[in-house]
Amino acid sequence: GDNILKVDSFLTHQVDFSLMREIGKVFAEKFASAGITKVVTIEASGIAPAVFTAEALNVPMIFAKKAKNITMNEGILTAQVYSFTKQVTSTVSIAGKFLSPEDKVLIIDDFLANGQAAKGLIQIIEQAGATVEAIGIVIEKSFQDGRDLLEKAGYPVLSLAR
């Protein structure tokens, strides 16, 4: 279809680590003054840019896990995320022990389309009482409304390609 971008050679399947390291440095520089304490993403393709961003900021990186149905353990924070690409709703989760009210979080993800993944991560982070400082996106599908949704909700969005 017209809405598909092929990025499997460097981002979503094979990872170009030197490119990811540069991406991490760019996000780290942009958000250097924000006092970021954690980088949060969603599995799987957000992990590479997020880990290099966290490395450049020298903070931990947490990735939300996707599961169709999750056995609710104590202290697990969850949100529902609808994927327009796969047309399926997933439960995403992060163990609450990894986020605290003192945390200032930078969300990093590979794509921004409709903003549903970021919205789910924001819900989880806010359940923990932590603050979302900004959202960094490798590739924004600017013909979709994700940025609008997130900025209207008060979250700064930086995308490296749109």
Curated annotation (Swiss-Prot):
Keywords attached to this entry: Cytoplasm, Glycosyltransferase, Purine salvage, Transferase
Species assigned in the record: Streptococcus mitis
EC top class, as a word: transferase
Taxonomy, superkingdom: Bacteria
GO molecular function, one term: xanthine phosphoribosyltransferase activity
Residues annotated as binding 5-phospho-alpha-D-ribose 1-diphosphate: 113-117
Keyword match Ribosomal protein: no
Subunit structure: Homodimer.
SUPFAM superfamilies: PRTase-like
Gene Ontology biological process terms from the UniProt entry: purine ribonucleoside salvage; xanthine metabolic process; XMP salvage
Effect on the protein of changing residue 58 to D: In strain: 12261
CDD domains: PRTases_typeI
Annotated GO CC locations: cytoplasm
Function of the protein: Converts the preformed base xanthine, a product of nucleic acid breakdown, to xanthosine 5'-monophosphate (XMP), so it can be reused for RNA or DNA synthesis.
Pathway where it operates: Purine metabolism; XMP biosynthesis via salvage pathway; XMP from xanthine: step 1/1
Enzyme Commission code(s) on record: 2.4.2.22
UniProt-recorded name of the protein: Xanthine phosphoribosyltransferase
Protein's cellular compartments: Cytoplasm
